[in-house]
Amino acid sequence: MKKIITAVALCIAAGALMGDVLNVKVWRGEKLAVLLSDEYHEIEGAAPGVSVETGAVLPVRYNKSPHSLEYALKADRAVLGSREPGRGFAVVTAAPDAKPGRYEFGQLVVTVLDRVLPQPREWKYYLDLWQHPWAVARVKGVKPFSKEHYAAMEPMWRMLSDAGQKTLTVTLVDQPWNHQCYDAYGSMVVHRKSADGKWSFDYSLFDEYVEFGRRCGLGPHISCYTMCPWGYMVDYIGPDGKVVRRSAKPGEPFFDEYWGDFLVDFSKHLESKGWLKDTYIAMDERSPDDLRYIAKFVRRVAPGLKIAMAGNRRPSEFSDIEIDSYSQAMAHINQPFLDEVPARQKEGKVTTYYICCGPDKPNTFMKSGPGEAFVCGFYPAACGLDGILRWAYNSWGSDALNDMTYSRWTAGDVALIYGDGSPSWRFLELRNGIVAAEKLRILREAGGQDAGIKELSAKFDAQKLIRGDNYEALRKAVMDFVNR
């Protein structure tokens, strides 16, 4: 079948342009997104085991800096099948049983190498992009957690699963991040307190959503936010049926009252569902004192639950706390931190890094340059970390389709997909980097390339990456190595 698309003003990703022919290399089982040149490209033909889909990366508006009234356009919304003016792109997919060799699709030449990439659910890479279901409901104009809402979320969540996502973001309280999101997060658990002071809990929505997320392929881990919300405020329904909102700060008597009975009951409920071993009480950039109190409280009251934390300190600074999943801010990664990772991995603990409103680069902002998102995805493989954490996958602003502006942070910080379910090019490049990371893991485990892997990994020092700007060259070095 013949497909013709138009592309404008772009750079080539994950391929080499030879004259008017684009050459790309893939492993069997791989899916790769590539940008096309700034000319008309004829992509034609079909082959058993290899498919090529094409589309356009459409322009999206964004402000150049937070609170700025200066706007720009950037091609970012990747729509398969689109023939609208925009950058052309193709998604190349090689089946696990594809025959190695050269495949010509007009001006696109695909070389399938004799190596096999496992399916995303089998990747060891730990991807943790936080989801926001309420944002989907608002954008689609449907009732939260209605049949229509789940139908709208499903393709978005399955696309995230296809990138190797290992966690499902759930909420234990209203507004776990206070009011920083455009759409409010609600609680998936209802807390009730009777006149005699007894507590009861309704897990109906929690169960429904976790089951849905798992059907979409998200998990197995369940990240529960949080016992330490920003502002410390929690809600419950009082004896008169009215919602009570009050502070529950770690160390105060009401904290123990509010969370004590809940943790015991929650653990029993999770055990009955078979989810206890996969569930984390998750916290975001909380103080050492808060984390210490909460972790000890959880270990005492509900020892089957795990603790997850995103912070900017080495795990050893919480030496009296067992943190099962720790994510370090990229700006604070140094060799002493990395030296602790192997011991944590031997204990079955997860250690990742995260980017958010910082660093300025490399990142996945609208303003980020070519290669940055790829580098962010690949970086953990080079330094021995398990993966990447990022807020957020889909916490959109007012216009989820045409404008990535968000008043508080750099444009693109809050979302990697669009309200119609289209991925951003940033997300596709992040996924390309994750795929390359998984390839490097496979090559490392196979042995025989230690010197080359060491040389490549040396290029990925976090502090040098933050100060650097040659991300396209790094991407090329990675792709050349894992595809040779």
Model-derived features: positions:
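Aromatic- and acid-rich polysaccharide-binding/catalytic face
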Residues: 308-334
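Catalytic-core region of carbohydrate-active enzymes that cleave or remodel glycosidic bonds
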Residues: 325-409
